[in-house]
Amino acid sequence: YASDASSATQTFNARLFDPHTNRYDRGSMTANAMPLAIGLVPEDRRAAVLSNLVADIRAHGNHVTAGDVGFHYVVRALMENDRGDVLFDLLSRTDAPSYGNQLAQGATALTEAWDANPRNSQNHFMLGHAETWLYGGLGGIRIDFDRPAWSRIRIAPQTVAGVDSASARYRSVLGDIATTWLRSGARLRLHVEVPPGATAQIELPTSKASEITESGVGLRRARGILRVSASDSRRVTVVVGSGSYDFEIPDIT
């Protein structure tokens, strides 16, 4: 299967990727977002393809041109590449095409078409992909059963300008997973609940592990902390066992 996957990826890129423009096919949002979301873009081209996707969204006034099939990949591509700021701008629009416009047209459920026109269904879930980011990005709760057991639950909230707090709760097969965060200036407080018998990998937006506290004490002395490491220059990763945790970061990245 690994060999087939590698062969399919190479064929896909050979036929659809333009190395001169760093775009797929005709460069639409869906064309660039889908390969980013499912891992088909060569590692040394990911940043450039992402940049093209973001530029396309900005050029359309923070509107999306993707429909039911493609919007899912746009959300995933931006979320997995830490561009929650772009998603927030996109989801905050009130003119068509947008969720805000659906509300302005009197919708009480998701409509089939972005412009909420009465010719289409007025109760249709096909454009509901934004909740992927609300739970997985803004709330920061993600589960991946392909990962090692200790990191299947990943907590990585994406704080964005314009949002000072958020909370999310997900009833998974492992038990309830919950997060609540509050930002005041550069200070961030994050509450996390990990279900019994599980562990979680928590990514905190700072490069200074020594400044992070959990329930008022440093990470090295806090109960339930199994591992502390620097993911990169912008994150500290903390692995914890089951229980409730209250982190505080005085200066987020």
Model-derived regions: residue spans:
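Non-catalytic C-terminal accessory modules of carbohydrate-active enzymes
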Residues: D85-T253
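Catalytic cores of carbohydrate-active enzymes
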Residues: Y1-Q122
